[in-house]
Amino acid sequence: MTSQYAAELCALLVEDNFGELFARIFSTLQRYDRLSLPRLKFYSRLSDRQLRHGLSAMIQHHLVYHYTSYDDGVTYYEPNLQAAYYLVRSGKILEFIEERLGKYAATLMETIMFLGHAQVGYLETLPELQPAPPKANGVKQEAEGGESEEQMNGDDVHTSDQPALLHPTLKALASHGYIFRVRDAQFQSYADNALDAERAIKSRPDVKQLKGKKLDETVLEGTVTLLKERLDGDLTRGLMHNGLPRGAKRRHGTGSADATNKKARMDYVDADEDEDEEENEWSDDEMGGDTTPMELAIVVRVNYEKLDVALRNRRFLDLAEMNSSPVTAQVYEGLLRRIEYQTKQCRDSAEIPREGEEGEQYSVPIALSAVTEEVDPQLDLAGSIGPMEISQAINKRGKRPLEDSVNGTDREGSEAPSRTYEVDQHLSLLSQPPYNLTSKRVLSGLITWTVEFRHLARKLRHLELERMIEARYGDVALRVIRVLHAKGKLDEKRLQEISLLPFKDLRQVLASMQSGGFVDLQEVPRDAQRQPSRTIYLWYYDPDRIRSSILEDTYKAMSRCMQRLRFERNRLKEFLEKTERSDVKGNEERYLSQAELTLLEQWKAKEALLLGEVARLDEMVAVMRDY
């Protein structure tokens, strides 16, 4: 993210979220990349007080790295562009957390985002993280545990239990990997940490005795290991049980299916859980009765890399929903969720390798039985995949004979293997071309299923590029692009033969796409004279170059949307300040005239339009860069 428009977008996001002081410091660091405090003061034209307060707050939000040199003892500061960009994804993340873990978890995550990082003991003192007191008018219906009478009388019986709600929620977020512990090395850039780790490895007595290639290999291996130790803030240890995070609710129904799986659920879900809470993803009871509070001295922050994994899985699920039945998509969701629990980040490398140079990267294998446990027992799996046994004998009347299991006489004995088989069939459907959403593996005689991340990430990028090309140039251009992508470099004659297009239409499409930068032309001379008549012209499609170009255009479009939003805010500054007053907010009908109400409605519609466009463009950035 070192391009011009990416830096411009990050500065606008910082200004929009934190104000002009943060934006000036961030822009100055962007322009000069790495500065000491005196030089930063000189270039930013800020006072010592402003600069120190601004830097301390920006360091808390991880917007600025700082590093003290071993040579001269001077502290240097540099911007963290990735943390600044993640500001645009905060709303999407909070929406996902609320959908997965509930409203209170989203409120807690929002608070941690607002603070940058926070100590658990400090979070206990915040009033916004305390649940609302029960109403005294008896509007709320029956409470669990026979507490309805005390609530109707207005007694605050939950006051002593309110702090206990924070810690199970923190444990749920930590066990899912959505928050992690803050380490000292996280305040420094990766390059500075790598240099420190390399210096520490080289200073070891056993390493000093090595020479040549052995020394280089030992230093490289030791540096990587030491970096992982210093940067590791994982809090999931001790909070995972049987591969599941504490607080994760397994899908379950009622009746015989629920009774069959009751014993398995007891490992991590309370069997007496109220069915009215099934709409919530987790509850305190599902923590297995663990009410031990987290250590108050732990400092936590948001784990954006893990959240990228969860958001990427949602895109994979959307791809499955487009090309399969809803039942198959739900089975795929269970597999992806199990994989998410054991996947820390989308990619090991920061940059996406070029097409053809990127190796396969399979997810952790998930046992078929584990996927079956994740699927709702009430889900009709057989209804969308047809008959299970195709080779059954047909009688004289043209009908297959009914088995005992169909009549229900042998249902209990065949239900478990039958359901496992059905889940396997749905996953097999997903493994078919063209998307190959799953892959089957047999490990030690155990059937497991995995997902090939890099293949699906490439597929998402190609689909995004094809959608854009079709929208700009039509379906004929899309056909040409697919031919070039599949066959490589082709001359015009061979391209016409494969695409089955008239020369006139083909040349028009190629010319328009070349002017737009989607296809390129390579000249291959047949002799040293390089005459046009003795030259072969090859058309080709380079998805890597186009991806970089589209990504830059997307940054530019997002930047223009943020600039337009800032302009509109400044134009209506006095009016918006009036609407944000504490006496006016929530009472607009009372304090605003009809013309002002109309203006406020127009402003909200315009703001929603611009922010919605930024969110849509962020989806494209995630596909092109992060997944």
From Swiss-Prot:
Region (Disordered): 131-162, 238-291, 394-420
Keyword Protein biosynthesis tagged: no
Biased composition (Acidic residues): 144-153, 269-288
Annotated region (Leucine-zipper), positions in chain: 554-575
Main subcellular location: nucleus
GO biological process, one term: DNA-templated transcription
Keywords: DNA-directed RNA polymerase, Nucleus, Transcription, Zinc
Database matches in InterPro entries: POLR3C_WHD (IPR055207), RNA_pol_III_RPC82-rel_HTH (IPR013197), RNA_pol_III_Rpc82_C (IPR008806), RPC3 (IPR039748), WH-like_DNA-bd_sf (IPR036388), WH_DNA-bd_sf (IPR036390)
Subcellular location: Nucleus
Superkingdom, natural source: Eukaryota
GO cellular component term of the entry, any: RNA polymerase III complex
Function per UniProt: DNA-dependent RNA polymerase catalyzes the transcription of DNA into RNA using the four ribonucleoside triphosphates as substrates. Specific core component of RNA polymerase III which synthesizes small RNAs, such as 5S rRNA and tRNAs.
Subunit structure: Component of the RNA polymerase III (Pol III) complex consisting of 17 subunits.
Family statement drawn from the similarity comment of this UniProt entry: Belongs to the RNA polymerase beta chain family.
Entry-linked PANTHER family: DNA-DIRECTED RNA POLYMERASE III SUBUNIT RPC3, RNA POLYMERASE III DNA DIRECTED -RELATED
Name of protein: DNA-directed RNA polymerase III subunit rpc3
